Amino acid sequence: MAIPVAYARDGDCVLFHGSTASRLFRLCAAGAPVCLTVTLLDGLVLARSAFESSMNYRSAMVLGHCSVLHGSMKLAALERISDHLMPGRWPEIRHPSVQELRATAVLELPLDECSVKISDGGPDDPEEDIPIPVWAGVLPLSEAWGSPLPAADLAAEFSTVPDYIRGWRR
C-alpha cells in the first residue's frame, strides 16, 4: 500500500507522521517492514519511438523498520516536518494540542538501507530512428509555488503575505 505523507530528513533518519487510527501507521509502529519512496519528476524524454521515450527523475527508496517517537522527541519531529514543508512558519502557528498529539503517530525510519536512482539525459534513439520526421528532445518539468491565496475568513490586519512565504522556492 502507498499513501502520500509529509516527511523530513533528520540526520540519518526520515521522519513522517500520520493518524494513529490508520491501519498502515499502526502496522509500521508495530514493527512491520517499511518501504518509503520519494520521486521527483524532472521532465519527459521524448524520443522518436514510444519504446525509447522515458522520464528524467530523481528517486530514493528506504527500507527498514520504524521507531515511534513520543513526548518532546515527537514534538521536535513535528516541528522538523513542518519546517521542511513550510520553512519559518512554526514560530507563528498554533502548536499541536494534547488531543491532536494523541491522534498523530510520528515515526522515525533509519537510513540504513537506501537506494537512489537518477535518470537525467536526452533521447537515446537508435540510428535507424534518427531520420524519422518527428520532434525529439526533453520537456523539462519544474515544481513552483503559485501566488498565495488568502483564506476567505482572514482578518484584514493579516492580509499582507509574510516575507518568509513570498520567499519560498523549491
Residue positions per predicted region:
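Residue-level signal for tight coil/turn positions that link beta-strands
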Residues: 11, 57, 111-113
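General beta-strand recognition
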Residues: 13-15, 35, 108, 117
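Short, surface-exposed beta-strand-loop junctions and turns on beta-sheet-rich folds
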Residues: 8, 22-24, 122-125
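A structural signal for short, well-ordered beta-strand segments
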Residues: 7, 64-66, 107-111
